[in-house]
From Swiss-Prot:
Catalytic activity: uridine(1939) in 23S rRNA + S-adenosyl-L-methionine = 5-methyluridine(1939) in 23S rRNA + S-adenosyl-L-homocysteine + H(+)
Gene3D superfamilies (UniProt xref): 2.40.50.1070, Nucleic acid-binding proteins, Vaccinia Virus protein VP39
Database matches in PROSITE patterns: SAM_MT_RNA_M5U, TRAM, TRMA_2
Organism for this UniProt entry: Methylobacillus flagellatus (strain ATCC 51484 / DSM 6875 / VKM B-1610 / KT)
Family stated for the protein in its record: Belongs to the class I-like SAM-binding methyltransferase superfamily. RNA M5U methyltransferase family. RlmD subfamily.
Name listed for the protein in its UniProt record: 23S rRNA (uracil(1939)-C(5))-methyltransferase RlmD
Enzyme Commission numbers on file: 2.1.1.190
Recorded coiled-coil stretches: none
Gene name for this UniProt entry: rlmD
GO aspect biological process, one term: rRNA base methylation
PANTHER family: 23S RRNA (URACIL(1939)-C(5))-METHYLTRANSFERASE RLMD, RNA M5U METHYLTRANSFERASE
InterPro entries: 23S_rRNA_MeTrfase_RlmD (IPR001566), MeTrfase_TrmA_CS (IPR030391), NA-bd_OB-fold (IPR012340), SAM-dependent_MTases_sf (IPR029063), TRAM_dom (IPR002792), U5_MeTrfase_fam (IPR010280)
Keywords (A to Z) from UniProt: 4Fe-4S, Iron, Iron-sulfur, Metal-binding, Methyltransferase, rRNA processing, S-adenosyl-L-methionine, Transferase
Entry-linked SUPFAM superfamilies: Nucleic acid-binding proteins, S-adenosyl-L-methionine-dependent methyltransferases
HAMAP family: 23SrRNA_methyltr_RlmD
């Protein structure tokens, strides 16, 4: 039986090449658009197959040598073999394709893509840990590609260099602990004044574990925390009084303290540029009342408030609402912002109307999108609907182009908005993750 050959047409949202052979869709790991490849099928379904590339018979001009020796085994990155500008262009095409095929809409203009450093950008990560005696001890890293096994790695180029350099010492540290078999994860969080490692422990540390942990923290200048159960069990182990984590937005004269397990943007360089773009699109003005839905710890809320607008933030996490209030007070903005805990996936038209009138919205939902929120807006076909609370402008920041496209379709086709602009934000270089931003404006009657 001859080895099958395919001509790759596009990339899917997992960074795999997409081809069609004899009426069947083939998803090929390691293949790029425009390439002719041979492949080996590893999973067969009735309508599609998943395969690995064997040989590249005709290579794309955008194919490049991966920058990390672990690429192809480690599952942390999916498209290091695609030249950096090609990654951004592929993500732009994914966004446009989703908007059209899912939302049945197109953006009136495409925004220039936002991108920054290709390496060392990832300031938060969850590293898997496994004690495997036959592999020489402890593994610390991301999962292997398409596997639940931990990749055997000694560095990671998307992590900041000082964190990458800790991978081998972390292996050695875990190997010295009494609970090396009961420590499945180390969560890394990098702030401007500190780096924190959170040890996820399934059993309590023993007294003899303190000495190696303290020696490690002192030698490498990090804080070591522990987490025994849920997020509320996260606490410092050593030192007990460190400088703590924070990030700043100098353009807006803002500083945000945060806990290592609280949600913050993984890429602080792109976060600053993304905020500038969001403010340019939102155009907040003094005296306006603006809603920030899924506001988290106030990453967008406080820059909006700096403009002189009054901002109302809603967030599902009580801990993040508390953190947002703390940051507002720290930055002398408590008088301009109000935060409320609410499950935005249970939004209703009545609840939305009860919040009062907003001139503008900013939405930054998780991967599930904001469907209940946008559905709560009055339909254009409902002539009797009260539209006094409807925002004239919506800026939507998305981490999933499929749910953005779905929500965009609702806003455009049933809620009376125009999709004025959209563009990609390369928050996660070398991965297939697509972050994007879109601007909607209420259409004239």
């Amino acid at each position: 039986m001859s080895t099958p050959i395919a001509l790759v047409e596009s990339l899917d949202q997992e960074g795999r090449g997409v081809a069609h052979v004899e009426g069947k869709t083939i998803f090929i790991d390691g293949a790029l658009p425009g390439e002719q490849v041979t492949y080996k099928v590893r999973r067969r379904k009735e309508r599609y197959e998943v395969a690995d590339v064997l040989d590249v018979l005709q290579a794309s001009h955008l194919r490049t040598q991966p920058g990390c020796e672990h690429f192809g085994v480690c599952g942390g990155c999916a498209i290091q073999h695609l030249e950096f500008s090609g990654q951004v262009a592929a993500k732009q095409r994914m966004l446009e394709s989703n908007l059209w095929h899912i939302g049945k809409t197109r953006s009136e203009r495409m925004l220039p893509p936002i991108y920054g450093p290709a390496w060392g950008y990832r300031h938060k990560a969850r590293l898997r840990v496994r004690h495997v005696a036959k592999k020489g001890g402890v593994l610390v890293g991301f999962n292997e590609k398409s596997s639940s096994f931990v990749a055997d790695m000694d560095s990671c180029r998307v992590l900041p260099p000082h964190v990458s350099n800790l991978i081998v010492p972390m292996k050695e540290l875990v190997g010295q602990l009494s609970i090396r078999d009961r420590l499945p994860q180390i969560e890394v969080a990098v702030g401007e004044l500190a780096t924190v490692l959170v040890l996820r422990i399934l059993e309590p540390l023993q007294p003899q574990d303190a000495a190696p942990i303290k020696a490690f923290a002192d030698r490498y200048g990090v804080e070591v925390w522990t987490q025994s159960k849920g997020p509320d069990t996260v606490q410092p182990f050593y030192p007990l009084q460190g400088p703590g984590l924070s990030y700043s937005l100098p353009e807006f004269n803002l500083t945000y303290p945060f806990k290592p397990t609280e949600f913050t943007q993984v890429n602080p360089y792109i976060n600053r540029v993304m905020l500038r773009r969001a403010m340019q699109l939102l155009q907040p003005q003094p005296g306006e009342r603006i809603a920030d839905f899924f506001c988290g710890l106030g990453n967008f809320t406080l820059p909006i408030a700096r403009s002189g607008a009054s901002v109302f933030g809603m967030e599902g996490s009580a801990a993040l609402v508390a953190r947002a209030n703390e940051s507002a007070a720290l930055n002398s903005l408590a008088g301009q912002v109000e935060f409320q805990e609410a499950d935005l996936f249970k939004m209703t038209p009545a609840l939305l109307q009860s919040l009062g009138r907003f001139d503008k919205w900013l939405i930054d939902p998780p991967r599930d999108g904001a469907i209940e929120l946008v559905k709560a807006l009055p339909d254009i076909e409902d002539a009797d609907a009260d539209t006094s609370h409807v925002p004239q402008r919506i800026v939507y920041v998305s981490c999933n182009p499929a749910t953005l496209a779905r929500d965009a379709g609702i806003l455009v086709h049933t809620k009376g908005y125009r999709l004025l602009a959209s563009g990609v934000i390369n928050m996660f270089p070398h991965t297939s993750h697509v972050e994007s931003i879109a601007l909607f404006e209420k259409a004239s009657p």
